[in-house]
């Protein structure tokens, strides 16, 4: 991968690079009961979503460099300092600080996948045993809408202030990539919406 400089100065100009996320197990980890919590009316058909996404990706690859969100996250997690900061933000957001040590010890590719698919909740207390939730850090079935949480204007990035908690983790993951990935460079952030989400 060569270094990519963020530089968007037109809404209609040639597309040089795009970030995508292929739908995966996070779709299968939704249940009819949890679908409304992650802003869906119904369960998606994963095979259909994958097929349609692959068609779109095939078209995009003809005209632009295509970067996969999960791959960029895995590469970003190689920065141990960033990995600790990101995990601290996520466990704080979801109130599962007891998982921080385990997540920090997880291999980067596995952790990147897990952050999209969801981190299962340990049913190690009566409260958790009785909880209808299956995940301590929920799956991110909206992650393939990468344009929702981040925008670029010229050489700087805007990290969205997501209206729903179900989308906050996406913004945190994208912020980490644009701040710490050693081959994606920008001139910083115009706005970091994750700062207001964590308050």
Language model segments and positions:
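The feature marks the mature, well-folded catalytic cores of soluble enzymes
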Residues: 1-199
């Amino acid at each position: 991968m060569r270094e990519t400089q963020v530089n968007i100065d037109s809404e209609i100009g040639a597309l040089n690079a795009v970030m995508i996320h292929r739908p995966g197990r996070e779709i299968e980890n939704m249940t009819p009961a949890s679908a409304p919590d992650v802003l869906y009316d119904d369960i998606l058909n994963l095979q259909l979503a994958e097929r349609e996404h692959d068609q779109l990706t095939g078209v995009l690859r003809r005209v632009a460099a295509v970067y996969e969100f999960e791959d960029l996250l895995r590469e970003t997690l190689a920065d141990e300092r960033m990995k600790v900061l990101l995990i601290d933000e996520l466990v704080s957001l979801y109130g599962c600080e007891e998982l921080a040590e385990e997540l920090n010890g997880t291999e980067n590719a596995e952790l990147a996948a897990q952050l999209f698919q969801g981190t299962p909740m340990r049913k190690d207390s009566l409260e958790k045993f009785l909880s209808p939730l299956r995940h301590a850090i929920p799956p991110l079935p909206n992650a393939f809408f990468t344009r929702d949480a981040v925008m670029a204007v010229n050489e700087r990035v805007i990290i969205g202030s997501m209206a729903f908690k179900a989308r906050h983790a996406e913004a945190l993951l994208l912020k980490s990539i644009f701040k710490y990935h050693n081959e994606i460079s920008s001139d910083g952030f115009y706005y970091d919406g994750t700062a207001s989400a964590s308050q």
